[in-house]
Swiss-Prot record:
UniProt keyword terms in alphabetical order: Cell inner membrane, Cell membrane, Membrane, NAD, Quinone, Translocase, Transport
Record's function text: NDH-1 shuttles electrons from NADH, via FMN and iron-sulfur (Fe-S) centers, to quinones in the respiratory chain. The immediate electron acceptor for the enzyme in this species is believed to be a menaquinone. Couples the redox reaction to proton translocation (for every two electrons transferred, four hydrogen ions are translocated across the cytoplasmic membrane), and thus conserves the redox energy in a proton gradient.
Family of this protein: Belongs to the complex I 49 kDa subunit family.
Name of the protein in question: NADH-quinone oxidoreductase subunit D
Taxonomic lineage of the native organism: Bacteria, Pseudomonadati, Chlorobiota, Chlorobiia, Chlorobiales
Length: 395
């Protein structure tokens, strides 16, 4: 009887799986998705595997493509705002704001100070709501169900506040070119302050639920490491880039609106609890950012001008027809930099060209590097740490 070969699997210091074998094997093609619970939408991954080890993972996109940029060429400037809600549908306020910043830059109009504080406040509320979804669903991906329930319990408070201000729970159409649709209700700031006081201890609770879970830590620590220089070369942004130790945040490094007047920190991992650039680091950044958003919201409440004689649409143009030119504007969204390039011919009330720069698309492009040398179950942890929304990836 012929002697059987053997395979030995081990991990290097950087947690990449190493296979030592003295028998012939061949790679196998494994498809994940486009209908798979771990891909957070209609994402397909074509993985080449050597046993349980992934040698390559190629994302296939387009299953949710809706021609957003082409629609922008046949819709007038204000009419595009509701379409932006449907890109990253978990952060509609942030999408609207990024688009409006670009058009306002093209029009060269000044925004009322109260409007600026309202925009910051509702966008930071939306940032927290988005991170709660990211943290809750990440727990489910790795087998922890309870944090999901806690996250959605607290997210409900935020959705109620945003519904009170805008009339909608997810697709808001609240931030308009030059202003906002409505002034916030009389007791809105009071209710927001009550939420801030309620949620501060909950942030600590949610943090401990996962970071003190030994299984969660072992599934994420040292997995999917992305060095800072490679992350920069991929043009990563948001929690993904900060998770690699790069302290880059547009609210601080390229500030817009009233962010220069606000005091807040940019959380980055210190390497004591996680390996810088791994899945756990990216999770920690999102958890810590919620605390900073609460600080920003409190400052907005205290610094916001009064509503006497205030018209939320005072700077909203009756007809938007920018002069001929082009502009690029960007904003710090929950998943990274969302940018809009807009080109105007100076004659039409519709953009000649509107290009959206999606952070989710850029972050997902590194999937091949993130997955190489990892085990198949680790792919679930890596995808969840990217926190993609396919509505923004495909547009």
């Amino acid at each position: 009887m012929a002697e059987q070969g053997s395979i030995r699997v081990s991990r290097k210091d950087d947690n990449v799986v190493v296979i030592e074998k003295d028998l012939a094997t061949e790679e196998m093609l494994l498809s994940m998705g486009p209908q798979h619970p771990s891909t957070h939408g209609v994402l397909k991954l074509e993985c080449m595997t050597d046993g349980e080890v992934v040698t390559s993972a190629e994302p296939y996109l387009g299953y949710l493509h809706r021609c957003f940029e082409k629609h922008c060429e046949v819709v007038d400037y204000p009419g595009i705002v509701p379409y932006t809600d449907r890109m990253d549908y978990l952060a509609g306020m942030n999408n609207e704001w990024a688009y409006c910043i670009a058009v306002e830059k093209l029009l060269d109009i000044e925004i009322p100070r109260r409007v600026e504080f309202i925009r910051v406040m509702v966008s930071e509320l939306n940032r927290i709501a988005s991170h709660l979804v990211a943290i809750g669903t990440y727990g489910i991906d790795l087998g922890a169900f309870t944090p999901f329930l806690f996250c959605f319990r607290d997210r409900e408070h935020i959705l109620n506040l945003l519904e009170w201000a805008s009339g909608a729970r997810m697709l808001y159409n609240y931030i308009w070119i030059g202003g906002v649709a409505f002034d916030i209700p009389a007791d809105f700031n009071k209710r927001v302050k009550e939420f801030v006081d309620y949620f501060r201890p909950k942030v600590v609770e949610l943090y401990k639920l996962l970071t003190e879970n030994e299984i969660f830590v072992k599934r994420t620590k040292g997995i999917g490491i992305m060095p800072a220089d490679v992350a920069i070369n991929y043009a990563w942004s948001g929690p993904m880039l900060r998770g690699s130790g790069v302290q880059w945040d547009l609210r601080r490094n390229d500030p817009y609106s009233v962010y220069p007047e606000l005091d807040f920190n940019i959380p980055v991992p210190d390497g004591k609890f996680s390996d810088i650039g791994d899945c756990l680091s990216r999770h920690l950044v999102r958890a810590l950012e919620m605390e900073e958003s609460l600080n920003i919201i409190e400052q907005c409440i205290s610094k916001m001008p009064g509503s006497d004689g205030f018209n939320p649409r005072s700077a909203v143009p009756k007809r938007v027809r920018p002069k001929a030119g082009e502009v690029y504007a960007r904003a710090e969204n929950p998943r990274g930099e969302l940018g809009f390039y807009i080109q105007s011919d100076g004659k039409s009330t519709k953009p000649l060209r509107c290009k959206a720069r999606s952070s989710c698309f850029v972050n997902l492009s590194a999937m091949k590097d993130l997955s190489k040398g990892q085990l198949i179950p680790d792919l679930v942890a890596i995808i969840g740490s990217i926190d993609i929304v396919l509505g923004e990836v495909d547009r």
